[in-house]
């Protein structure tokens, strides 16, 4: 997911400075010399990659699944709303978070910041991309309460010990 986050944030940051046909291209400035794509790019944010079909165990390839979800959210919600959700939901993630955990954290973040106004759009994107279960099925796990996520994250956090100094 980390590569996908990085690609999304770079694409979102530079989107307003690029012509429309290049907005979903990451690294187009570098890829000119070796990419045969038109337009040239290292990776694209508007791919049709889905989970688990396109998961290959390579961080950049797999990151394209995540960045495509985030870019689709940006297209649906607008850059300002999507960027706030993407950045804020990081506080709910742990080093072991998976795609589904992060999608649920986005839903929870929207519930906290926007009273859930965008939950249906968020859920639809992640269901369509194969990351969240289809809500019409028996398993309806999309969206956890903030307290539940915080408690789970606290359980996973390593315990810290503080050495106490002895006073004289």
Model-derived features with residue positions:
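Zinc-dependent metallohydrolase catalytic domains
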Residues: 1-160
């Amino acid at each position: 997911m980390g590569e996908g986050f990085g690609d999304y944030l770079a694409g979102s940051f530079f989107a307003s400075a690029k012509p429309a046909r290049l907005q979903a291209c990451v690294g187009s400035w570098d890829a000119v010399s070796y990419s045969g794509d038109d337009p040239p790019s290292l990776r694209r944010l508007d791919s049709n990659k889905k989970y688990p079909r396109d998961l290959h165990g390579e961080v950049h390839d797999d990151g394209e699944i995540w960045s495509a979800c985030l870019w689709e959210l940006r297209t649906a919600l607008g850059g300002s709303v999507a960027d706030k959700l993407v950045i804020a939901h990081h506080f709910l993630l742990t080093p072991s978070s998976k795609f589904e955990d992060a999608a649920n954290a986005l839903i929870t973040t929207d519930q906290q910041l926007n009273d859930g106004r965008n939950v249906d759009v968020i859920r639809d994107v992640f269901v369509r991309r194969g990351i969240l279960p289809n809500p019409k099925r028996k398993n309806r796990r999309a969206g956890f309460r903030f307290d539940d996520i915080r408690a789970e994250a606290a359980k996973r956090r390593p315990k810290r010990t503080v050495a106490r100094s002895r006073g004289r």
